[in-house]
Regions:
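Extracytoplasmic small-molecule ligand-binding "clamshell" domains
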Residues: 34-134, 295
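Ligand-binding clefts/hinges and TM-proximal coupling segments of bilobed small-molecule sensing domains
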Residues: 36-53, 186-203, 248-249, 281-316
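Beta->alpha turn/N-cap motifs
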Residues: 72-77, 112-117, 126, 130-138, ...
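Ligand-binding cleft/hinge of the Venus flytrap
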Residues: 84, 99-106, 187-210, 240-244
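Short helices/loops that flank or line small-molecule/ion binding pockets
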Residues: 100-104, 112-113, 117-130, 144-145, ...
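A ligand-binding cleft/hinge motif common to bilobed small-molecule-binding domains
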Residues: 117-121, 135-142, 190-199, 222-258, ...
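Periplasmic-binding protein-like
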Residues: 152-159, 241-281, 298-316
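Flexible hinge/capping segments at coil-to-helix
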Residues: 161-179
Length: 316
């Protein structure tokens, strides 16, 4: 059985190898679709109060602040959530969804930035009413928190816009390709599992590549040193819209072979989850949910219906 090949590159090594294209790549963000990262967010979508959602809030639930929905959020990278050009206002899909959910409950929105590792404590301590920050539903997390699902957890294969590759959606499609992925992630586990299956069936192994810098990774793809990048779909969709130099050729559930969903987290048994689920389903029915997704180029990750405490990924 031929062993899998894998390569790890540091930023300096790759930059020196492909410096000839760096100057051109630095202006790519101006060539594609510019998403709004201003603090003003003039095109942010707003909605009216949803009586059904308001009624679904348990009488026992106490909000952190009167007339306000306080949401914990971890600003990372666009389009999910990031800081605006003023370096202090949180913008992105999660912020927009939090806004329309707050609107539907007839409340003002307050976003509280939290470190990723601290979101459970922020909820348990009562610092926030809910957390909306790309949290995947797992059976282990459901022991402590309630969830209202709002988006598919997807990872995606992206290639150069002029690549001859049309589709990468199943194990045999990646055989023999040079694919960049992220070490220690679900997407790496998926890619390695697919590669193992391919080798067992006599197909060519994947040449797995790892980079310690996203910009360098993108440069490697544009230079033809890799055939595809397999990473978080949302962030790659944003880059594709901004730069116009890559395109999607396949998505896979982040929990493959199971389906994984992202959800708003609330304290277990607090009485807020059903109201959030009602709000989300009414936003889906009205088309507002789709508009919010499309504003951040995330339409491919839509769900048909929100659920309270949907099946989560099993504890490993």
């Amino acid at each position: 059985m031929k062993p899998q090949r894998s390569l790890r590159f540091t930023g300096l090594a790759v930059l020196s190898a492909i410096a000839s294209i760096a100057m051109g790549f630095s202006t790519l963000a101006l060539a594609g679709v510019a998403l709004d990262l201003s603090p003003q967010q003039p095109d942010r979508i707003r909605v009216q109060k949803d009586p059904a959602a308001v009624k679904a809030v348990s009488a026992q639930f106490r909000f952190v602040k009167d007339d306000t929905l306080t949401i914990g959020i971890h600003p990372t990278i666009p389009p999910i959530s990031t800081y605006a050009t003023d370096a202090k206002t949180v913008v992105g899909f999660d912020a927009d969804l939090a806004q329309v959910v707050a609107d539907s409950l007839g409340r003002k929105l307050e976003l509280v930035p939290v470190a990723w590792a601290d979101w459970p404590l922020a909820l348990e301590s009562g610092k926030v009413d809910a957390v909306l920050s790309n949290v995947t539903v797992t059976e282990e997390r459901k022991l402590k928190f309630d969830f209202s699902s709002y988006r598919q957890d997807q990872v995606g294969f992206y290639v150069k816009s002029d690549s001859k590759i049309v589709s990468l959606k199943e194990p045999k499609d990646v055989a023999g390709l040079r694919i960049v992925t992220d070490s220690g992630t679900n997407q790496e586990k998926i890619l390695l599992a697919w590669d193992k299956e391919n080798v067992a069936h006599g197909l060519k192994p994947v040449a797995v590549q790892y980079y310690d810098d996203v910009a360098v990774r993108n440069l490697a793809l544009q230079a033809g040193r890799a055939d595809a990048v397999f990473s978080v779909n949302a962030t790659q969709a944003y880059q594709a819209a901004q730069q116009g130099k890559t395109r999607l050729v396949g998505t896979v559930s982040g929990g493959w072979p199971r389906t994984a969903e992202l959800a708003i987290a609330t304290r277990k048994g607090s009485g807020l989850a059903d109201a959030l689920t009602t709000s989300l389903n009414d936003l889906i029915a009205s088309g507002t949910y789709t508009r919010v997704l499309d504003r951040w180029n995330l339409g491919s990750e839509a769900i048909a219906r929100s659920a309270t405490n949907p099946p989560g990924l099993p504890k490993l």
